[in-house]
Structures are given as structure tokens and as C-alpha cells.
Amino acid sequence: VFLCIRSGDSGRWWYEYVRKRMTVVYEDNHIIIVNKTASEIVQGDKTGDTPLSEIVKQYLKEKYQKPGNVFIGVTHRLDRPVSGLVVFAKTSKALSRLNEMFKTSEVKKTYWAIVKNAPKEPEGELVNYLVRNEKQNKSYAYDKEVPKSKKAILHYRLIGKSDNYFLLEVDLKTGRHHQIRCQLAKMGCPIKGDLKYGFARSNPDGSICLHARHISFVHPVSKEMIEVEAPVPPTNLWQGFQMI
């Protein structure tokens, strides 16, 4: 969804426009979970493009006909070229609790990644030490601890094959900057389209083939288990895998 929201924009036409293009996979009184498309930004940045957080806020304002400001809290982020699940808080209580849950790794996140090269082992755990370069907006992976590094752990499993690519399922154990992109590249399996981490060519739409597929956590207020899954992008590439 790419919109420039003008002051005073409102009405059912706008709500219907967004509703048809933004996939809400779960909503209750405290949280809303959206399937983000690649190219959307979760929170405002220097580009000035309308962030997903603002689109969700306007969507809720129209859906419930709220006269005042609508509260939306950003609990975590996905890189702009990544698609998949994003959790927003609709109340301050949910926001503070979810922030703590993400910080303490109480939220389980699973990603799917398309890579050109098959991993040497079909399943394994990657442990690296990542150093973030702010100027380059890039992380570098090391086998041993180095100054300013942070330990990064993920588990991967080969789950699908196509004529030209392999599909990996990735469970994050830590949440570091560009962690999956960096660690898979370090393993020799850069994500399709990810020029920054060594893939040869970009994707035509500027995306990378990384998708936040599944998320589960204990609801911050009701304490029920929330478990949701996002459909992969509707392209031949994503749909063309034979699952193992």
C-alpha cells in the first residue's frame, strides 16, 4: 500500500481502498496484525513515505468512525524489502507489554527465505557475532566475539525446492539488525534479491525474498496464545516450490 495521506482525507472510499490492499490477519481490542508487502516501511523515515503504522491508524479511524486521534504502537519492525507479519498495539498497555516480550524473546518468529545455493546441511543452527555499521546500514558476521559484536543465533531448515532455488525456514533465537540476511549470507546462502548481502541481482520490485511467515506469543492482556500465519506473496516464484 503506497499512499500519500493528506490532511482531512477521510470517508468510506479511503477505508475501502485500504481494506482491499492491506491484509489484516488478526485483530482484537488490544492488537492488530498485518501482512506487510515488500516496499512498505513500518515506521516513518527520512524518505517521507507514508509508513504502515500511519496507514493502519487511518484504517482503524475509518473502520470504527473514531472522531479523535487513534493510538497505534509499533512493537517491532521489518526491513522495507521484507514482507510478512507485523504486530501493532492498539493500547498503551499492550504496547508496553509487547515491547518487553519482544525484548526478552518471548515472541516466536519464523521466516521463509528463498536462496540460490543449497546449505551444506539441510538443517542446523547458526551462531555468529554481528557488528552493525550504522553508516552503511549493514551488519557483518564473525565466527568469534569481536569488539562491539552481539551474539546472533538462528535455526534453519530446508523445506522446499524448485528448479532454480531453495526454500529455507528460519527460526530466530535473537533479534539482531539484518540478522537473517547477514547470517545466511555468511553461510554462503544469500537471499534472492539481496544485493547488500551478496546476491548477484536485485528483484524487479526491489524486494528481497524474505517473508515473516509465522508468529506466536501469549496475548499481552488476555494471556491467550496467539498464533498467526501470513500467506506468501502471490508470485510464481513463491508458489513454485515442491515442499520437502
Predicted regions and their residues:
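RNA pseudouridine synthases
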Residues: 1-244
